[in-house]
């Protein structure tokens, strides 16, 4: 049996509060606080409510369906998949306000520790590139060969032919992956933007795509890193370089 069983879905009027620890807005519903995807603090929305049962426990999540009172910081999300794949949470929020929300979230977390309450939090360093920066993608593969993402709330599979966050090389590889029907349900694609090195796992046995590499190499500020397939590596290479330069300065 699927670990996550959908019980029912409905619609409700919600008044959105703060951003929660998972990145979604928080709203009160039936006496409890729930996460609502696609909102901005202060908005009044009609949301689609999803009730789930997981391991004998009940959970409730929501997705904005209609905005009644819109925030001044709301913008049109540039990605056609936004809201369906749920990989991006804040494309509907003006970028400058995104940075303010991130800073506020860090301050809120620090307040939970007496030893960190007085620590001064600097403004968030804006990314030089809001799109085409990710050096790592993990795609889901359906039996019919379609490649894409799974909506984290509805668990519905969303076929994707282009992801605005990924480097052009990863998107080119994504196009090649469509409909080759590999014998796997997950594919990991990684790319070194400063070296041109790449990794596709698992081995696909397809001549058009080099795959099965155990690692790839990336250059950060003159330092070569050997990144294994399961290893963590900062997905925004340019920001990682800027961070290392700040630490060393």
Where are these regions (language model features)?
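Accessory RNA-recognition modules of RNA-modification enzymes
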Residues: 1-249
């Amino acid at each position: 049996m699927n670990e996550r069983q959908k019980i029912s879905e409905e619609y409700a009027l919600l008044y959105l509060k703060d951003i929660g620890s998972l990145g979604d807005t928080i709203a009160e519903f039936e006496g409890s606080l729930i996460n609502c995807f696609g909102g901005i603090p202060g908005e009044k929305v009609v949301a689609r409510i999803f009730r789930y049962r997981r391991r004998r426990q009940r959970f409730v999540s929501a997705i904005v369906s209609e905005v009644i009172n819109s925030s001044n910081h709301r913008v049109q999300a540039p990605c056609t998949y936004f809201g369906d794949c749920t990989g991006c949470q804040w494309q509907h929020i003006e970028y400058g306000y995104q940075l303010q929300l991130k800073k506020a979230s860090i301050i809120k977390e620090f307040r939970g520790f007496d030893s960190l309450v007085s620590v001064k939090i600097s403004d968030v360093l804006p990314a030089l590139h809001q799109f085409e920066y990710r050096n790592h993608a993990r795609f889901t593969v359906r039996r019919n060969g379609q490649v894409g993402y799974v909506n984290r709330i509805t668990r519905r599979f969303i076929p994707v032919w282009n992801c605005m966050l990924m480097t052009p090389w990863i998107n080119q590889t994504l196009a090649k992956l469509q409909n080759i029907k590999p014998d796997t349900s997950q594919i990991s694609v990684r790319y070194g933007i400063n070296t041109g090195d790449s990794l596709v796992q698992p081995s696909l046995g397809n001549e058009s795509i080099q795959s099965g590499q155990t690692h790839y190499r990336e250059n950060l500020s003159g330092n070569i890193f050997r990144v294994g397939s399961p290893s963590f590596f900062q997905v925004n290479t340019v920001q990682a370089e800027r961070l290392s330069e700040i630490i060393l300065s």
